[in-house]
Structure formats: C-alpha cells, structure tokens
Amino acid sequence: MVKGTLYTYPENFRAYKALIAAQYSGAQVKVADNFKFGETNKSAEFLKKFPGGKVPAFETAEGQYLSESNAIAYLLANEQLRGGKCPFVQAQVQQWISFADNEIVPASCAWVFPLLGILPQQKNSTAKQEAEAVLQQLNQKLQDATFLAGERITLADIVVFSSLLHLYEYVLEPSVRSAFGNVNRWFVTILNQKQVQAVVKDYKLCEKALVFDPKKYAEFQAKTGAAKPQQQAQQQKQEKKPKEKKEAPKKAAEPAEELDAADEALAAEPKSKDPFDALPKGTFNFDDFKRVYSNEDEAKSIPYFFDKFDAENYSIWFGEYKYNEELSKVFMSCNLITGMFQRLDKMRKAAFASVCLFGEDGNSTISGIWVWRGQDLAFTLSPDWQIDYEVYDWKKLDAKSEETKKLVTQYFSWSGTDKDGRKFNQGKIFK
C-alpha cells in the first residue's frame, strides 16, 4: 500500500484527483501541514525534491518524489480505478483523462477565471460556447453509460469530475445546465459517493452564475501584484538592461502557477447554507423518529410518527414515477431509486422517505411517501436537489386524514399493492 505526503493548498481541484483515488484504494496520504503556495513550493528544500515547484506534489514514505496531478492519482489508485484488467477500458481511462486536461480545464478556466477577477475579460470570448460544446460531448457519452470507462467508477470519472467542479460551482446555473441532464445525473452521482464526500466537502451547485466585475478583477490583481504593468515597465526602464533581460522570461514561465493561485482564491469563496435553515424547525425530530423506525417494529414506529408529527411545520407528500411503462428489470428500477437517494444525500437531515417498487420484471411501478420540513416541495429549495424530482408526479397529503394514515402505514410497512393491484416487491428507505 502506498504511503506518503501530498503537498497542496486547501480545495485544489488538481489535488482532489489524488485524494479521492486514495479514498478508494486505502492509500495512506497525509496532506502537508502549513503549506503556503508561493512560499513553500519556492523554497530551496522543496525545489530540491520537485524542481518544477508545481503542486500538487507527492513524496512517498520511501523518499521518492512525484509531480503532476494525474500521475499522483494513478500511483494512489487501485486496479479498478486504473481500468481493471481490460486493456480497452484502461485505454478509455487515459482517453478521458486527456480529454479533461485538453478540453475541459482550458474551457473552464477561460470562462470562470475572468468572472472571479483572476483574468481580464476578453471581448468576443467564446469560452462559454467552448465549455458547452465539451459538456455536450459528455452528455452524449453518458446517454447510455453510467460511468465514462467500463461499468464501475474509474480515474476517468474522478479526473473529469474534478475538472468540472468550477463550472458547476460558479457558472452552470439551472437554466444553463438543464441542457446537459445526463452529465448532471452523473456529476451528482459521483459527488455523492462517500469516497468523494470525504474529500469534496460542503459543495453546492451553482444557483446564479457569476458575472464579470471590474472591481473584483482590480482587487485580485492588486493582491497578487499583477495589476501594475505600467509601473513595472517604468521600473524596468530605470534598471540596467541586463537585469531587464533576465526578468522578462521569468514572467512568461509562471502561468501554471498563476492558475494554482487562482484555485487558492477559489477556496476562499463563501459556502452556501443548508436550504432548510430558512424554514421553522417545529417540534418534529427527524433523528428521533429515524432511530425509532430503525430499531422498533412498525407496530410501534408508525404510531410514534403520527403522535409526534408536526403538521404545521412539516408536510407529507406522495411521489409517483411518471414513466412506469418504461421500467424493465426490477434491479434497474431499484437502481433508479438508489441513484435518486444518492443525489439527494444532503437533504437527509430534514427529510425521510419510503419508496416502493411494485410488480415484477416488465410490469412494475415506483412510488413513495416523502416527509420533509416545510409546506412546499423541498426540491425547489436548492438546485442540488432538482436532478430527479421532475420525473415524478407530486401530491401533498392531508396529514390528518384517515386515507393518508392508511397510505403512510402501507408504505412505511412495505406492504399492500399499488393502485393497479401490483404486489409489493421491495422498498428503499431515505433517512
């Protein structure tokens, strides 16, 4: 098992590749303490190990040194992430890694960095169109595929996902990303993997795209010392010509580091709050109910639910899948439910659901009972939660009616039939 130290600054998307790979493989990676970009990586000690001064950089426990984020991720990965035993899948992994570096990252930087004040805004820029063209390629690929290479998550998914983080955080607002539904589902699925959640924390999808702000650009340039080209030119004229020649190439050799500094600036952006925080908490305690439901028989847990339920601040909803006629294999239908749960992971704190599959292969339906804080559809509170809900018909139920109590009892106890008489097959709990 690989052990070592990773040199990087917080929330560097390039370092995420390696850290996520390590979560899958079990590699023991320590992130270097007190790393400061622009100082640590320019020190004589660091440059002796990594002459390029680039980050992320990795030092193994045996004293071996490796740079370039994709190479580090490969070292820390396991066989599955590298493509398994199939040479073609291995080649596909490399294909998508190259695609990320050559197509996604340049388009993302050209679109996002000017909006963050890192680069000047270019007139007649085609960055947005180029990024959307890249996303369209991905969308087509993912139309009939769950993952980018093979049937399981690989470095292809990890690297492409990491390269898309800035786009999904800063510019792909709902109206824009709606054109890339396949990519959206894949992106949120990867985001909600526990190995990814351990690395990419408190991430929120873009709600409103950034716009260029000249003031922000001026402030960033002043902070990094790059906003005074005229003053630098005047100083160079006053200095001796030999010195002027020495400094000219130095500035041209630093663009890669400027992009790393940009990532550092991105990490300082404020994170959004839990969408449920704006709603009254009421008296219903989801944690207590979930504990009772998990540990007690339905004969106790269901009466407990109705006894404690706060109808003033919480609501009960019935959700029915719109395209039941398209369902085929039972296991595939169950994957639809599980995938939705994964994409709604951050909603669990103030929600509960029992979603059931009725019927059999080629003749089945999906429907469920959902409970959450608030009186309106919870999915509209956050773009993160809007991937799947539109493929369901939603009906708000009267918590005090006997009909609702019977329906809740049926779904919470996994029993009965659907409205057309199909027998209960299996269920999934969102808690």
Swiss-Prot record:
Ranges for domain EF-1-gamma C-terminal come to 272-431
Where in the numbering of this chain does the GST N-terminal domain appear? 2-84
Q: Bias category Low complexity: which stretches? A: 226-236
What upregulates or represses it?
Produces at least 2 transcripts by alternative transcriptional initiation encoding identical proteins; one of these transcripts (EF1gamma-RA) is induced by ecdysone signaling during pupation.
Q: Which SUPFAM superfamilies match?
A: eEF1-gamma domain (SSF89942), GST C-terminal domain-like (SSF47616), Thioredoxin-like (SSF52833)
Task: Give an example GO cellular component term for this record.
Answer: eukaryotic translation elongation factor 1 complex
Modified residue Phosphoserine is at which positions? 294
Say if the entry is tagged with keyword Protein biosynthesis. yes
- UniProt-annotated stretches for the region Disordered: 223-261
Name the domain of life this protein comes from. Answer: Eukaryota
Q: Which residues form the GST C-terminal domain?
A: 86-212
Q: How is it modified after translation?
A: Phosphorylated on Ser-294 by LAMMER kinases, including Doa. Phosphorylation on Ser-294 by Doa is required for negative regulation of microtubule-based transport.
Entry coiled-coil feature ranges: none
Which keywords does this Swiss-Prot/TrEMBL entry list?
Cytoplasm, Cytoskeleton, Elongation factor, Nucleus, Phosphoprotein, Protein biosynthesis
What does gene deletion cause?
A: Increased larval lethality. Some adults survive, probably due to maternal contribution, but have shortened posterior scutellar bristle macrochaetae. RNAi-mediated knockdown is larval lethal. RNAi-mediated knockdown in sensory organ precursor cells prevents formation of thoracic bristles. RNAi-mediated knockdown in the developing eye disrupts its morphology.
> What role does it play?
Microtubule binding protein involved in regulation of microtubule-based transport. Probably plays a role in anchoring the EF-1 complex to other cellular components. Probably involved in formation and/or development of mechanosensory organs during metamorphosis. Required for cellular and organismal viability. Not essential for the innate immune response to bacterial infection.
Q: How does it assemble?
A: Interacts with microtubules. May interact with BicDR; the interaction is probably indirect. Interacts (via C-terminus) with Doa; the interaction is probably direct, is transient and leads to phosphorylation of eEF1gamma by Doa. EF-1 is composed of four subunits: alpha, beta, delta, and gamma.
UniProt name for this protein: Elongation factor 1-gamma
Q: Which gene encodes it?
A: eEF1gamma
